[in-house]
C-alpha cells in the first residue's frame, strides 16, 4: 500500500496551495537544469508558507552548495539528485538537521535486472538517508525498468518516480509495490499543476 505521495516541482503559491490539498509532501527545484527550477528566493518563500513537508530538490553535488541553499531557504527537507558523497550527505544531516531523500537512477531498459538491482542495492547501502527515491532522472518524465525497482523495493521501502501519470501509476504500484510515489509532469497541463489530473492521480493511488 502506498503511504506517501509527493507532488513535486511547485513554482508558485497557487501551485503550492493546490498540491497541499492532496499530497503528503511537495518539492521545489533549485540549481538544476529542470524547467521547473526557481530562484532560491522563491524557494525560500514557498518553504516558509508550506503547510506540508516541502523538499528542496537539486542536482548540486557538494556540501558547500547544499549548505548555502539550505541556509538561504530554511529547508528542512532535501532531495539529492546527484552522486554526492555519503559523508557529505551525513554532514548535512548532522549540521543542519535536514531530512534527506536520496535519488538513485534506474536504467530505462535493463539487460540484466538482477545485476542492475544488485549494483544499486550496494550503492544505496552506502547512504544513511530518510527516504530512497528510484527515478529515471530528475524531472525526466520518463519511466524506467520496473523489474529493477521491484527487486529493490523488496529490500527497502522506496519512493517510485519517473514518468508516472494517472493512466500508468496503478500498474506501476502493482508491479513495484513502492512505499511511496513522486509525480511532477504527470499531473501538469501546459506546464502547470492541474487539479483534474491531480485528483485522477490521487484516486488511483488511494483506491487502486
Curated annotation (Swiss-Prot):
| EC numbers, comma separated | 5.3.1.24
GO MF terms, alphabetically ordered: phosphoribosylanthranilate isomerase activity
Q: In which pathway does it act?
A: Amino-acid biosynthesis; L-tryptophan biosynthesis; L-tryptophan from chorismate: step 3/5
- Classification via InterPro entries: Aldolase_TIM (IPR013785), PRAI_dom (IPR001240), RibuloseP-bd_barrel (IPR011060), TrpF_fam (IPR044643)
Q: Which UniProt keywords apply?
A: Amino-acid biosynthesis, Aromatic amino acid biosynthesis, Isomerase, Tryptophan biosynthesis
Q: Which BP terms does GO give this entry?
A: L-tryptophan biosynthetic process
User: What would be one Pfam family of this protein?
Assistant: PRAI
Kindly report, in one word, the top-level EC class recorded for this enzyme.
isomerase
Family label:
Belongs to the TrpF family.
Among HAMAP family, the record links this protein to:
PRAI
Entry protein name: N-(5'-phosphoribosyl)anthranilate isomerase
The taxonomic lineage of its organism, from the top, reads: Archaea, Methanobacteriati, Methanobacteriota, Thermococci, Thermococcales
User: What gene, per UniProt, encodes this protein?
Assistant: trpF
